[in-house]
Amino acid sequence: MSTNRVAIVAVVAVLLAGAVFAVRSFADDAPMPQAGQAAPDFTLPSQDGSNISLDSFRGKWVVLYFYPKDMTTGCTIEAHNFQADIDKYQKLDAVVVGVSVDSTGSHKEFCAKEGLSFKLLSDQDKKVVAQYGSMADYMGVKIAKRNTFLIDPQGKIVQVWTGVKPSEHSKEVLAALNGYEKK
């Protein structure tokens, strides 16, 4: 075999391997559920060690927010803002639930350090993050994208926010929730 043919075969092999890797990288991230669809149910452990099912919140509004990492600047700002507004959410019969790929121990430390009273769920196997189309790859590490799903008391998604700004997001969600409550 000539040197040119060997080089061509090598290039094709590398391209095929890259294509297989790319397909595998994206295959674990399902399409994002949209407004009007039933929210996919799941059960995950929380910062206090209890297992929490999305279905256990039936009859209440749910603010299900995915975030990249405990104790980072943007995630701390977003969590502080949800906490600052927690009484407003409760008056609207809504619960705030955060999900990241961090451990329950990390969540427990984050809640204690930042004074968070709402549930943070640990999705270390990344199945729920993927199920909600919220997987991101950060320098080769799979983390959650900053996405939020507003779920009505019957378990239907009514609004989705993607790539949110942590400093403004809780106010956006409250405004939307107030609008749905008035309908």
Can you name each region flagged by the protein language model?
Residues R5-A13, G18-D41:
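N-proximal helix/coil linker or "cap" segments that precede and/or mark the start of modular domains
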Residues P33, F42-V62:
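A short beta-strand-turn-helix
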Residues A39-P40, W61, K145-N147:
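Short loop/turn microsegments at loop-to-beta-strand junctions
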Residues D55-T76:
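Short active-site neighborhood of thiol/selenol oxidoreductases, capturing the structured segment around
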Residues M71, T76-L116, Q124-V129:
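Structural microenvironment flanking redox-active thiols in thiol-disulfide oxidoreductases
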Residues L116-F118, M135-Y138, K142-F149:
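Structural micro-motif
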Residues I143-K183:
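Thiol-/selenol-based redox modules, centered on thioredoxin-like
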